[in-house]
């Protein structure tokens, strides 16, 4: 199971970095966690952001703000990646 999670983490990491997201940010960490959970078939798909907030002991609005900020930063840096 850990090998599978490590493989997913690597794939998600490569994808997020190819989109210009920075691994050192909280938004990246939150997105990485949420995507790995979804790829593993979490039963909480409709509440993945709430689950992410609970996992990181953060308020939901803080998690969403960090994710939006990181995606916006990546878009401003290179909008072509999102075409």
Give the predicted meaning of each segment:
Residues 4-26, 33-35, 40-83:
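Basic, alpha-helical nucleic-acid-binding regions used in initiation and control of genome expression
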């Amino acid at each position: 199971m850990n090998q599978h999670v490590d493989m997913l983490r690597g794939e998600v990491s490569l994808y997020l970095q190819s989109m210009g997201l920075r691994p050192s940010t909280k938004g990246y960490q939150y997105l990485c966690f949420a995507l790995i959970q979804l790829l593993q078939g979490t039963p909480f798909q409709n509440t993945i952001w709430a689950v992410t907030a609970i996992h990181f002991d953060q308020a939901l609005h803080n998690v969403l703000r960090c994710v939006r900020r990181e995606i916006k930063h990546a878009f401003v840096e290179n909008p072509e990646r999102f075409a």
